[in-house]
């Protein structure tokens, strides 16, 4: 019986993705290669995953060429990509950009862009330019950083705020005059990041995708960001699996270290944190929330911020439990710690995320107390 809220077809997808990514991972060798390249992207693997396996369209509606498996489908995929730290633009293109386009684009633009996403024919980097870009005389100026997967994007989708406080969504070619994309090495070498600068870039040089109000746009962003919770669950599961395997093999004082009570307790704490994060992630994707956008927004806030904190704690504990080997470059555990640290701050910090949730439900919060600090 599949765990709530998944059905058998979701578990079939999980097994297919898990098998494919296991081959890609190659026992951790691929992560070392991707990290050494410095761009956090494996083009050949992405083409195979998106096109041959059909995973790019997992959550996109069938009318646009996708599989129509919604939030649950992408939760399954995100969890498995997190387990292997798959270096590809699944989140930026197939989750974040796809959600924005589905929510606010015209029907013609949906048919065009969502079908290209579903077929794996386009990579889109969706950027929030509010507070970062200035818009005067229909010219954009400023810099957005970090810009996830912008280095490899075929389309830069930018949200800006006009004088009427509307959110305007515009798509630009990376070759647009005045637009520059500069890759940089972030804390996480398995995820591609860049700075995208706008120097008098005209709105008319891009394709207007849609327009909406700030509240609707913010909710859409947070619901998309909630998918990162599944990635954190996958990464946390990998850290726990590696730790349990090591504790059952490492011998100290004449016995396996996993037999010591202090080690057992630490592993139990890691498991509890992981399962709590998993529950939050699955609830945020539950069909029970369909039709209630506010509930989806709140569930996504809880999931993303709790799961990212849990992943960070689990990854840190895993390194400590591995002793000296946990600090070596050759052992892949540090990549998971870096992804956990990156996810914790990506888009919004956990502190800001919990404060946003407190404001949403009308609660005066102490975010340090909420986060157990």
Question: How would you label these PLM feature ranges?
Answer:
Residues 130-141:
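Cytochrome P450 C-terminal beta-domain/meander region
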Residues 143-179:
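A short core secondary-structure module
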Residues 86-108:
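N-terminal glycine-rich flavin-associated loop
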Residues 146-147, 173-208:
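Flexible, small-/acidic-enriched active-site or ligand-binding loops
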Residues 119-129, 158:
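A short, Trp-centered hydrophobic/proline-enriched beta-strand micro-motif
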Residues 113-114, 132, 144-148, 157-161, ...:
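A generic local secondary-structure boundary/capping motif
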């Amino acid at each position: 019986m599949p765990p709530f809220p998944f059905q058998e077809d979701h578990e079939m997808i999980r097994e297919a993705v898990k098998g494919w990514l296991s081959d890609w991972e190659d026992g951790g060798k691929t992560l070392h290669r991707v990290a050494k390249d410095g761009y956090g992207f494996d083009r050949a693997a992405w083409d195979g995953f998106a096109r041959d396996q059909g995973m790019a369209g997992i959550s996109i509606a069938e009318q646009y060429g996708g599989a129509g498996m919604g939030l649950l489908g992408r939760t399954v995929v995100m969890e498995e990509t997190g387990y292997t730290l798959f270096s590809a633009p699944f989140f930026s293109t197939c989750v974040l950009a796809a959600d924005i386009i589905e929510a606010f684009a015209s029907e013609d633009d949906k048919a065009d862009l969502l079908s290209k996403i579903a077929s794996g024919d386009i990579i889109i980097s969706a950027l929030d330019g509010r507070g970062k870009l200035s818009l005067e005389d229909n010219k954009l100026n400023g810099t957005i950083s970090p810009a996830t997967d912008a280095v490899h994007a075929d389309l830069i989708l930018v949200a800006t705020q006009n004088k009427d406080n509307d959110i305007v969504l515009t798509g630009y070619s990376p070759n647009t005059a005045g637009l520059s994309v500069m890759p940089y090495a972030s804390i996480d070498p398995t995820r591609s990041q860049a700075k995208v600068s706008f120097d008098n870039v005209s709105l008319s040089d891009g394709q207007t995708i849609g327009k909406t109000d700030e509240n609707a746009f913010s909710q859409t962003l947070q619901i998309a960001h909630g998918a990162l919770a599944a990635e954190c669950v996958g990464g946390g599961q990998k850290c726990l699996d590696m730790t349990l395997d090591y504790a059952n093999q490492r011998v100290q004082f004449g016995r396996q270290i996993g037999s010591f009570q202090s080690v057992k307790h630490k592993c139990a704490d890691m498991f509890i944190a992981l399962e709590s994060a998993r529950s939050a992630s699955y609830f945020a994707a539950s069909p029970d929330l369909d039709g209630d956008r506010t509930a989806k927004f709140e569930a996504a806030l809880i999931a993303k911020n709790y799961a990212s904190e849990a992943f960070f704690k689990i990854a840190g504990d895993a390194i400590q439990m591995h002793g000296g080997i946990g600090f070596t470059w050759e052992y892949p555990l540090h990549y998971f710690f870096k992804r956990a640290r990156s996810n914790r701050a990506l888009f919004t910090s956990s502190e800001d995320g919990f404060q946003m949730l407190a404001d949403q439900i009308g609660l005066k919060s102490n975010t340090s107390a909420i986060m157990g600090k």
